[in-house]
Amino acid sequence: MTLLQTPEDWVLADTTPVLRVLVGRFPAQCLFPSAALGVIVAIVEEVLDEWIARVMVHYRWHYDENALHVLSAGSGRKLQLSDLQDFEIYHWGPRACRATGTELLSQQRAAEDEYIGMLELLENQLASTRYALGNRPSAVDAILLGGLRAHTLADPIPDLSR
């Protein structure tokens, strides 16, 4: 989860509010372009913020290997599969997946296929531009990097080394 503590001692959670505060404080570094492109960036950022989160929750809690990895790191000890049942969040995961439309195996496969497909498109784009939408960063890059850094590259599954 993205967290930002401000000089006023506010703690902001979630990428979208964090980006909005940063834009207000550092307008020269704005991640939301002006005019029509800014509208598109805002819409894509908002959609990806919710869509990527649901896929990440699926990966984390439908794959015991991922749950074991994150709960071992969080507890500071090497857990066994049988230990997972002791963690309330382990039981929360499947409920969250049901609420976000990744409960059924067919929904899980569809979400994974969409996510991997999006990453492949992004990789192709980044072969010709520095950032997802061109040669300067936008809020879309922040959203994409958040899911990649916090989950995809940190958890055992999916394995993007292929």
Label every model-predicted segment.
Residues 54-162:
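GST-like fold's C-terminal all-alpha helical module
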Residues 1-82, 132:
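GST-like domain detector, emphasizing the conserved glutathione-binding G-site
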